Amino acid sequence: MAKKTQADLNEVLPLSPAVFYILLALPDGPKHGYAIMKEVEEMTEGKITLGPGSLYGSIKRLLKDRMIAETDHRPARALDDERRRYYILTDYGRQVLAAEVDRLASAVRLAGQKAVYAGTI
């Protein structure tokens, strides 16, 4: 897939927190749904928990939008359940994730300039 322009990427931004954290769970390699769910919970120290409906609804949309893809890459058979589906981040998904990280970083910089941070509100 050709690299998208910033205007193309801005059409899908901002991402919902669920979609953002699902994408953020995948750059390290393939994961199945339950592993994504646990990684999101761990990354956010329990602040974001994805239920099955939210997780798999988001995965379905991410697959349709080609931000993630199913992969046949699996761990050793002894460690795996053949019913599991594994997902990877696509190049487009990586571009979208990077654009969202830039957008969020800009928002944090702006909040810092306005002296809006914990303890002042």
Label for each model-derived stretch:
Residues 1-11:
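Short, Lys/Arg-enriched N-terminal segment that forms or immediately precedes the first helix
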Residues 3, 92-121:
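Amphipathic alpha-helical dimerization/coiled-coil segments
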Residues 10-54:
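N-terminal helix-turn-helix DNA-binding core of bacterial DNA-binding proteins
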Residues 55-62:
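Basic amphipathic alpha-helical segments that dock to polyanions
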Residues 65-80:
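Beta-hairpin "wing" of winged helix-turn-helix
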Residues 83:
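Exposed loop/turn and edge beta-strand positions of beta-sandwich/beta-sheet ligand-binding modules
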